[in-house]
Amino acid sequence: MPLHVEILSTGDELLTGQVVDTNSTWLMDRLWDLGVMVRRKTLVGDDRADLDAALRETSGRSDLVVVSGGMGPTEDDLTSERVAAVLGVPLELHEPSLRALEERFRKFGRAMTPNNEKQARFPRGAEVIPNRFGSAPGFAVRIGRAEVVCFPGVPVEYRGLADEWLLPRVAARLGEVPASRLLKLFAVPESHADHAMRPVMDDPANEGVRFGFRAHWPEVHVKWTVPGPGADARAARIAAAVRGIFGDAVFGEAKEELPALVVARLAARGERVALAESCTGGLLAELVTGVPGASAVIDLGVVAYANAMKEAVLGVPAPLLAAHGAVSEPVARALAEGARRAGRATWGLGITGIAGPTGGTPEKPVGTVHVALAGPGGTTAVERLYRGDRERIRKTAAFEALNLLRLALR
């Protein structure tokens, strides 16, 4: 029998759009790795009647209900209270949780106000789940057919408790855990990925395998979950097939990120990169330096927006700019070579383009971007025409530069 799981997320801030419920999407992804697809997700505000109704409805049709939020010390934190009301039991003080809470306040040198005691009160009979990630413990009860698990809504606490307590419990309940794999593709449209994967997905040998695609442009993630005996071997065969279909477009697996991958490859080779950016305005440098250990591979990053700075700082010849314009392949090449020279680096990356929303022409419309890579074997360049708003164009251009370097570092 499949495990019927629902997620119940609480808080007015979720319904007003002030906070995005990332906890639910994270948990859905982790449960999918176990072969469990969440059947429903419900959002409910800080209203007693609505919470009571949602708890009764979800617990009446599911095996497991995961509740987030409403576990804090304030007046609008209602989860423990409403679970107790639905069960028809009182709230009781859990002394170990109270002592842990008092110790936490002492540790941080803060006075504990009386309302914080609320975080140590749970419905009678609840299983209390200690929280080493924050102040409010979680708890689990049974309402009707369902196990109802309640966690704080703070993401680091919610995810920590789910990883340590909930997911192992679900895995044990399922018995045999399926094998899940994820490969990341660069700049392959989701529809193209789906079409290219049809022979794999329609293969009778892959019957029962659950495939999924997620666009996180300029990345597309291909994921599959294989049930039953020999799941690991079957998942590995699918991975080989996916790599065969997409070739160099595959840049990483589940937790690999393109900036970190590029930094790691540079470090392993003892090489360095220098950056020259125009339309991306330092976004490429931010991606690289956001990786721990990036100081081992980068000394220089320049944002040369004005033509005068392209000439003065990076040595782009004025006649080249006059002849071709700042947004052109020759200038992108000169930027990359100038960065490599100025940074005394193994590699130089140059980006120039029109991010919009204004500045485009019929010959060079908004979204026109030139990216160049200068290296020991010479300089290569690509021209792209990106769609989307300014933010999307700039982001895609920065990742395009990283991908160009990744391919050179194979």
UniProtKB/Swiss-Prot annotation:
Entries under SMART domains matching the protein = MoCF_biosynth
Q: Which InterPro entries match?
A: CinA, CinA-like_C, CinA_C, Competence-induced_CinA, MoaB/Mog-like_dom_sf, MoaB/Mog_dom
Against Pfam families, the record matches this protein to: CinA (PF02464), MoCF_biosynth (PF00994)
Q: Read off the NCBIfam families from this record.
A: cinA_nterm, molyb_syn, PncC_domain, PRK00549.1
Which family, according to the similarity comment? Belongs to the CinA family.
Question: What is the protein's given name?
Answer: CinA-like protein
Q: What organism does this protein naturally occur in?
A: Anaeromyxobacter sp. (strain Fw109-5)
Q: What is the lineage of its organism?
A: Bacteria, Pseudomonadati, Myxococcota, Myxococcia, Myxococcales
